[in-house]
Amino acid sequence: MSDTKNLNHDRQKALDNAISQIEKAFGRGAIMKLKQGAIEKIDSIPTGSIALDTALGIGGFPKGRIIEIFGPESSGKTTLALHVIAESQKKGGNCAFIDAEHALDIMYARKLGVNTGDLIVSQPDTGEQALHIVEYLICSGAIDVIVVDSVAALTPRAEIEGDMGDQHMGLQARLLSHALRKLTSIVSKANCILIFINQIRMKIGVVYGNPETTTGGNALKFYSSVRLDIRKVSAIKDKDVIIGNQTKVKVVKNKVAPPFKQVDFDIMYNEGISKVGEIIDMGVKLNIVEKAGSYYSYNSVRLGQGKENAKLYLKNNPSTADEIEQKIRASLQASDNDVSCFNAEVDSISDMDVPVF
């Protein structure tokens, strides 16, 4: 028994000496023990959607992590990223938008609540330049959210300087892989959120399984803590005029909470994510708002016939909307963030949706 104690004592002493040497070589904090009090709750920034914040498990995008938002064209990828910027700015955060596509609509960003006067915008000429700018901003330690729009537009310098028909196999994937190896650690230390918007391509010759894939190789799939698949489900019409889109978002990878949650919300033109529409949808799911046929009511007060009329009522009565929202948040908190109503169907999870850890 005494021999065992002596052995354990010697092992512990050797470990303490090793830790001491590591701290002398690399500084305090380079290595530590995760004691009971050392584990803290992951800080987050809201996405602008109550349902998506709940599905993510921690109330929004985790700080100090890399996020990927991908989907087809005009599905709401940039809109969601701009909402995150707006939410961060409300808390006094500094945000940057790396517009590699050279297509940022400043007027639309303002309508979503972005303070464009304080927004840092860059329109880089090459992929290398864009990623260097991202690195410098993160290393400043003063940035909270950086959005790169998009990965597909991060064109390597060799491709730009070459002829139009030249083949450059894997250049972009190698560029992104090299950059992410450097960025992943400094993003964590700076406690900022780095959001990559990505496009979808089709794999040639795929007979079985999902032919869709994202650009930039596999590195971003591995380094991302959260990956969101955003899709346009249907058009929202006012008579014959399309005024928005019903959007579906699936959390296909999540390192901070259980993945495979799925949410729906409305994205209205010139407005962004419809908060009142989401309040109605979640209120119905949680039995806070009553729905009988096409009529919506709350506390025996009829909100309107049809969802658009109910949304109009809540816009004109913000106190009622706030009251319903508070009840929704309280209900979700009381159920310990039980988001079983947002679970995606197993059959709908495609090959591309399987998370990469």
UniProtKB/Swiss-Prot annotation:
Signal sequence interval, chain numbering: none
A Pfam family this chain is assigned to: RecA_C
Keywords per UniProt: ATP-binding, Cytoplasm, DNA damage, DNA recombination, DNA repair, DNA-binding, Nucleotide-binding, SOS response
SUPFAM superfamilies: P-loop containing nucleoside triphosphate hydrolases, RecA protein, C-terminal domain
Chain positions recorded as ATP binding sites: G71, P72, E73, S74, S75, G76, K77, T78
CDD domains linked to this entry: RecA
One cellular component (GO) term of this entry: cytosol
Top-rank taxon, per record: Bacteria
PROSITE patterns xrefs: RECA_1, RECA_2, RECA_3
Keyword DNA-binding: yes
Keyword presence, Glycosyltransferase: no
Localisation: Cytoplasm
GO molecular function, one term: ATP hydrolysis activity
GO-annotated biological processes: DNA recombination; DNA repair; SOS response
InterPro entries: AAA+_ATPase, DNA_recomb/repair_RecA, DNA_recomb/repair_RecA_CS, P-loop_NTPase, RecA-like_C, RecA-like_N, RecA_ATP-bd, RecA_C_sf
NCBIfam families per the UniProt record, alphabetical: tigrfam_recA
PANTHER family named in the record: MITOCHONDRIAL DNA REPAIR PROTEIN RECA HOMOLOG-RELATED (PTHR45900:SF1), RECA (PTHR45900)
Similarity-based family: Belongs to the RecA family.
Function noted in UniProt: Can catalyze the hydrolysis of ATP in the presence of single-stranded DNA, the ATP-dependent uptake of single-stranded DNA by duplex DNA, and the ATP-dependent hybridization of homologous single-stranded DNAs. It interacts with LexA causing its activation and leading to its autocatalytic cleavage.
Protein name, entry field: Protein RecA
Gene encoding the protein: recA
